[in-house]
Amino acid sequence: MPLRLEIKRKFAQRSERVKSVDLHPTEPWILASLYSGTLCIWNYQTQTMVKSFDVTELPVRSAKFIARKQWVVAGADDMFIRVYNYNTMDKIKVFEAHADYIRCVAVHPTLPYVLSSSDDMLIKLWDWEKGWLCTQIFEGHSHYVMQVTFNPKDTNTFASASLDRTIKIWNLGSPDPNFTLDAHLKGVNCVDYFTGGDKPYLITGSDDHTAKVWDYQTKSCVQTLEGHTHNVSAVSFHPELPIIITGSEDGTVRIWHATTYRLENTLNYGLERVWAIGHIKGSRRVVIGYDEGSIMVKLGREIPVASMDNSGKIIWAKHNEIHTVNIKSVGADEVTDGERLPLAVKELGTCDLYPQSLKHNPNGRFVVVCGDGEYIIYTALAWRNRSFGSALEFVWSSDGEHAVRESSTKIKIFSKNFQEKKTVRPTFSAEHIFGGTLLTMCSSDFICFYDWAECRLIRRIDVTVKNLYWADSGDLVAIASDTSFYILKFNRDIVSSYFDGGKQIDEEGIEDAFELLNETNERVRTGLWVGDCFIYTNSSWRLNYCVGGEVTTMYHLDRPMYLLGYLANQSRVYLIDKEFNVIGYTLLLSLIEYKTLVMRGDLEQANEVLPSIPKEHHNSVAHFLESRGMTEDALEVATDPDYRFELAIQLGRLAVAKDIAVEAQNESKWKQLGELAMSSGKLDMAEECMRHAMDLSGLLLLYSSLGDADGMMKLAALAKEQGKNNVAFLCLFMLGQVEDCLHLLVESNRIPEAALMARSYLPSKVSEIVALWRNDLTKISPKAAESLADPEEYPNLFEEWQVALSLENRAAETRGVHPPAGDYCSHADRDHTTLVDAFRIMQIEEEGRLEQGDVLDEVGEEGEDGEEEEEEDRQEESSDGRQQNVEEEAVVVDADSTDGAVLVNGNESEEQWVLTPPQE
């Protein structure tokens, strides 16, 4: 059966001819040496060039990373080896290494050695700790030495490939080869070692269009791979997968099964001839160098093949080797969230096929391994073969039966004792099957659920499925798609009644068999159920759990990790990474149980469970309750003061919020509480909160609204002390303390504003402030200072200046007088004429009467002379009457005016001055 291998292109970049490629072990970098003489480092994640080195004008045929030194070493046709620091771009070393073109450089995995091979038929060993001294020369080939490579299982030996048609195996300590393989009919271009521990193999590629697999212990050819139509220029045993990769000048890359040597796939990206193949241990990425650029592909999935049973025993497959560990062997005090568990790994055995999936049955007694189109069922303890067969996919039922998908049109169901029960041929193309409570078959755009006993259709659902997870109870199922997952409830009783009643079921199945509970827009990578709680890792590598549609993030994972299982007695969920490191995280079973009971509406039972949840997890419970609209309960459960304060504010529980604010003594809390108290009409509490929060603007609003003059006085002093001059000014102004306002403006260096205010409210202070203004302005612009006019010097420039001076003393008597709010009605109906306007009216009346008197005088002079004295007496009486009326005119201060304007209130027959008491 064919090897099921996903191949995804991850990087493509056109360039000059690529002669060699290499992958960085930790950075997402590809190193490419070009025929044009340039070295390029590409980031395959961002698809951008990171570094570029102009090495020479001749071809650079080989380059490698030396990651432990942050170096790149390159050999070129100018016969020089160059070493660069890829971080600083500095050139570390340049030296002439050979007498002809340098074909290959190879870096020792642990020692400070670099091998180089050349068209001068020599291989040289260089030691960078000795200043790149040539410590050894290996002679023996009779033609160009095309490639050298270290043996990963014995780094003291290496192999060389030459156009003299041979492969030679060397020891670092000896100048002579250990042995020679007459490998091909034509020149050998490339060689690579098998990295697995079970086969002493190497592979070669030749100009005779073939690749050959050799056993270097028996010195025999194991297999010849035929299929390329031109020279084979690159060969590779993949370090992680059971495949061989060959590249040829025919433009194709062929993928062969490393065990069966069957051709699995052929890649052709249309970039002309293939010159190089690069890979790295621990990664499934493969980079290919062509005439016209580079391609990187990812082969298969990186999910580790592993399974954990309910007791904490883990079995995993690495290549064909099977290993086991037991989580219970680690003490509870040695387990820390997010840390790798120090587990003792035991070798359990080997597998006859390459495992692509591995899964325990529900009771943990058996383990199935599936791959290469076959399956084998082993006993979990002794690893004995119990059953086998053909299968593209294998799934367990919840009670120990199993099903296999042999093809898209044939599915077999087996009993608990591994006997075939039934063969099903679906009417559609079944691309996947899933086990669990029901047998599920998937096409490209829908899934169908069947019962295990009779394989009767239960329900068809139109959804594209990536994976499916059943809860242990069999009542809940999670269906994961590419972008979201759905939680469905399986109505077992409804299905049973349909079957028992013999009702007809159409092609859509039983409509009420499933009930959609919720949908979450997150991609599930791996998942499992614990009770009614669905635990999963998402596409952002966060470990989440979902209860009743409420998603909670447990941890942010720092690398890709995959769920193994949950141990209830430890209250921990376990994950594994691709390096088979096992990591545990705490997830309390009592917490899950509590949330489940709340979702079911069983609050009484939930409250009984609550005490079993440790206090440090109560905030998580409170957040959950709040999300369910149970804010009162959340306040009772929460322990974090900040969170409790937010809940108390949300509920309007001012007393609780105040107690928290008193303990915290946090300004923001006092301010927030003050605003709520103000809006709730709790003015005393609002005042207290604003004072604690130093919310002077809020206090100004409060005191001005209440008409609290004493509060305004205290606030003015506090604001001035705190440097809040705007608030202090408003307080003083509303209190009528104009002199203090002027002093505050002057102290704040707002002298122009002080002068303007004095002109309006204290004319007698204008000259004094203008003098200050001049002195201050002289420092900046003497000419501008001279242009300032003092009203004492130039009264003609100030309109009604004498009127203002006359009114100042009278206004001073009423300034600062604040009638109580209870007297508002007696003031509201009064005339709101300002003092200045009243004074103007008086002046106009006086001038009119004076003009009228002048006219009478003129008439008397032209008439009888005897009447002159009588007319004078009349004028004197009239003048005395007017003077008396003026003194009796009424003056009223407008209590609603913030500038303390004086109002005139009177009538034609009687005028009287009324002064409002001064405000303080």
UniProtKB/Swiss-Prot annotation:
It is a peripheral membrane protein. GO terms for cellular component: COPI-coated vesicle membrane; Golgi membrane; membrane coat; mitochondrion. Residues 850-920 are annotated as: Disordered. One of its GO terms (molecular function) is structural molecule activity. Pfam families: B-prop_COPA_B_2nd (PF04053), TPR_COPA_B (PF23953), WD40 (PF00400). The keyword Transport applies. Signal peptide: none annotated. Transmembrane segments: none annotated. WD repeats lie at residues 13-52, 55-94, 97-136, 140-180, 183-224, 227-266, 350-392, 460-500. GO terms for biological process: intracellular protein transport; vesicle-mediated transport. Its main location: cytoplasm. Residues 854-875 have a biased composition (Acidic residues). Keywords: Cytoplasm, Cytoplasmic vesicle, ER-Golgi transport, Golgi apparatus, Membrane, Protein transport, Repeat, Transport, WD repeat. It is found in: Cytoplasm; Golgi apparatus membrane; Cytoplasmic vesicle, COPI-coated vesicle membrane. The keyword Membrane applies. The coatomer is a cytosolic protein complex that binds to dilysine motifs and reversibly associates with Golgi non-clathrin-coated vesicles, which further mediate biosynthetic protein transport from the ER, via the Golgi up to the trans Golgi network. Coatomer complex is required for budding from Golgi membranes, and is essential for the retrograde Golgi-to-ER transport of dilysine-tagged proteins. Oligomeric complex that consists of at least the alpha, beta, beta', gamma, delta, epsilon and zeta subunits. Belongs to the WD repeat COPB2 family. This is Coatomer subunit beta'-1.
